Swiss-Prot record:
Optimum pH is 6.5. This is Probable trehalose-phosphate phosphatase 2. SUPFAM superfamilies: HAD-like. The keyword Hydrolase applies. It is an enzyme of class 3 (hydrolase). Removes the phosphate from trehalose 6-phosphate to produce free trehalose. Trehalose accumulation in plant may improve abiotic stress tolerance. It catalyses: alpha,alpha-trehalose 6-phosphate + H2O = alpha,alpha-trehalose + phosphate. It comes from the Eukaryota. Pathway: Glycan biosynthesis; trehalose biosynthesis.
């Protein structure tokens, strides 16, 4: 992404027309997929020696331990204060390269003038706080009001790892577009007549208000397999204290936020033991969660591209997409915007992280403040 001296992203070449694959193979394909289309090429590997497997498991354990910032300290002592001061310094240095979207709001406004904004939002950790029980990740009424307000001014979509139905139950706003299961289950607008032809995997449907929408589910052939794996994993981890399963329709989440750290390795071992018989599925990690997904070339970044095209905003020089998210899975969306120089990402984090987002905010409270400022600017400028 090109930068001005004021550290604002400059939109260069527009995004090329999205060329989506036209066919999806069934999940029964045994071990590999063609190099073209949605499927990732994953030839069957020879078994690795025990030592290498131990290293691989150790690497996953490190990721699991590092996947979420530590809990706030309940007591004060000198060592903790020194550590906090060091982290504070690291964060201040990090913000130089990923400036606050609030303190840099004028730069964002200057960039947005004369452009049509499209807003993409993660849910957990972005619109709602991260909580011990994922079923309790409820957004506040004030946040819902802020999201409703911006959605009345800009096309707005929620792109979440949760199932689409579940995230809608949390948000409860019909003004939005929803992409669940990391973009593998999208309810988007019916394409404009001047855009490219209807994608073959889109299903014409209606939403809860009777409005015509398109459903796009590129991993639909995997549903029987995902359901089967969910049952096996539920049985496998049921005796690990604190482990929790979540069925997100096109992916399965194994939450270990409430698991004792000494049991992290056991969680990983049991999950991988089940998955070894499913080469068409892959394991990824997020914030205190292991996620099982189909091996297809689809993610939140692809979902952003799909929605932009569905909205008739793809390849337009006067369009500015903004993506706000907090998790590793949101990096796919940040990368798409950065690589194509068409917009920018805002990372929600109070600790320094490697990211392709240009701006940052600390927490959902700052996300809400940013949304309110964005809505106020739009109304004042029209």
């Amino acid at each position: 992404m090109d930068l001005k001296t004021s550290n604002s992203p400059v939109i260069a070449d527009p995004l090329p027309k999205l060329a989506l694959p036209s066919a999806v193979m069934t999940y029964t394909t045994p071990t590999s997929f063609p190099s073209t289309g949605l499927y990732l090429n994953t030839p069957k590997k020879k078994p690795l020696p025990g030592k290498i497997e131990e290293v691989r498991a150790a690497g996953w354990l490190d990721l699991m331990l590092a996947s979420s910032p530590p809990r706030k300290r309940q007591t004060k002592d000198f060592a903790n204060d020194v550590q906090a001061d060091e982290l504070d310094l690291l964060y201040r240095n990090w913000v130089v390269n990923h400036p606050s979207a609030l303190t840099s709001f004028e730069d964002i406004v200057n960039l947005a003038r004369g452009k049509r904004l499209a807003l993409f939002l993660d849910y957990d950790g972005t619109l709602s706080p991260i909580v011990d029980n994922p079923e309790n990740a409820v957004m506040s009424d004030e946040m819902r009001s802020a999201v409703k307000h911006v959605a009345s001014l800009f096309p707005t979509a929620i792109i979440s790892g949760r199932s689409r139905d579940k995230v809608f139950d949390f948000v409860k706003l019909t003004e939005l577009y929803y992409a669940g299961s990391h973009g593998m289950d999208i309810m988007g607008p019916v394409r404009k007549s001047d855009s490219s032809g209807q994608h073959v995997e889109c299903i014409r449907s209606t939403d809860s208000e009777g409005k015509e929408v398109n459903l796009f589910q590129p991993a639909s052939e995997f549903l029987p397999m995902i359901s089967e794996v969910y049952k096996k994993l539920s049985e496998s981890i049921k005796d690990i204290d604190g482990a929790r399963m979540e069925d997100n329709k096109f992916c399965v989440s194994v939450h270990y936020r409430n698991v004792a750290p000494h049991d992290y390795g056991e969680v990983h071992q049991r999950v991988t033991a089940v998955l070894k018989n499913y080469p068409c599925l892959r394991l990824t990690h997020g914030r205190k969660v292991l996620e099982v997904r189909p091996v297809i070339d689809w993610n939140k970044g692809k979902a952003v591209e799909f929605l932009l095209e569905s909205l008739g905003l793809c390849g337009k020089e006067d369009v500015l997409p903004i993506y706000v998210g907090d998790d590793k899975t949101d990096e796919d969306a940040f990368k798409v915007l950065k690589a194509n120089s068409i917009g920018f990402g805002i990372l929600v984090s109070s600790v320094p992280k490697d990211t392709d987002a240009f701006y940052s905010v600390r927490d959902p409270a700052e996300v809400m403040e940013f949304l309110k400022k964005l809505a106020s600017w739009k109304e004042e400028s029209t």
